[in-house]
């Protein structure tokens, strides 16, 4: 809506090719990686930014991503983080990944997400930390680091759609040693 139909169409056409290239050139984090969708989703928004030669402002890319999240809000709304069931679902997905990322997997996929549960602020809280983020690492390699803090801000949107509140003090994108989710 901001750039006209012809320009948007050209960028989206280029984006498809760029997206495939980005996925092919990304570090292998495992085909069966339970968190791989996070990187694939982010790359679908990095692609038009790269395809436009960074002529689309990062804030516009963030808005595109935010709108897509609201478009599938029904999916996130199925989980209510205010209920025991919702908290259990959230924890289950994080624990599933933590169990998947064994020392053998870490050797095989050293640049994948690293998750831990160090420093839980409140007993019973949904809390974890990401201490290595392949999305940030790849953004640095691609020269699009400016997108990362904006993408991280969208974690709050996802948590809000799950009827929760994200309390965050650190992100790797902002120079922190980890991203905290609480």
Specify the residue positions occupied by each region the protein language model found.
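Non-catalytic recognition/regulatory regions in large multidomain proteins
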Residues: 124-129, 139, 145-151, 169-174
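Proline- and acidic/polar-enriched loop/turn elements at helix boundaries
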Residues: 12, 63-65, 151, 171
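Amphipathic interaction/junction segments at domain boundaries or subunit interfaces
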Residues: 37-141
């Amino acid at each position: 809506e901001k750039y006209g139909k012809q320009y948007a169409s050209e960028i989206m056409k280029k984006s498809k090719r760029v997206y495939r290239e980005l996925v092919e050139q990304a570090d292998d984090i495992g085909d069966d990686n339970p968190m791989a969708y996070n990187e694939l989703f982010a790359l679908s928004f990095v692609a038009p930014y790269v395809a436009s030669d960074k002529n689309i402002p990062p804030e516009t890319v963030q808005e595109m991503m935010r709108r897509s999240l609201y478009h599938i809000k029904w999916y996130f709304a199925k989980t209510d983080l205010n209920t025991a069931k919702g908290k259990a679902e959230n924890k289950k997905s994080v624990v599933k990944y933590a169990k998947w990322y064994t020392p053998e997997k870490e050797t095989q996929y050293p640049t994948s997400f690293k998750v831990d549960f160090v420093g839980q602020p409140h007993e019973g809280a949904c809390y974890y930390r990401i201490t290595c983020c392949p999305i940030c690492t790849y953004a640095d390699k691609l020269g699009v680091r400016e997108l990362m803090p904006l993408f991280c801000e969208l974690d709050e949107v996802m948590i809000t759609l799950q009827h929760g509140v994200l309390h965050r003090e650190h992100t790797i994108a902002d120079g922190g040693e980890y991203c905290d989710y609480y």
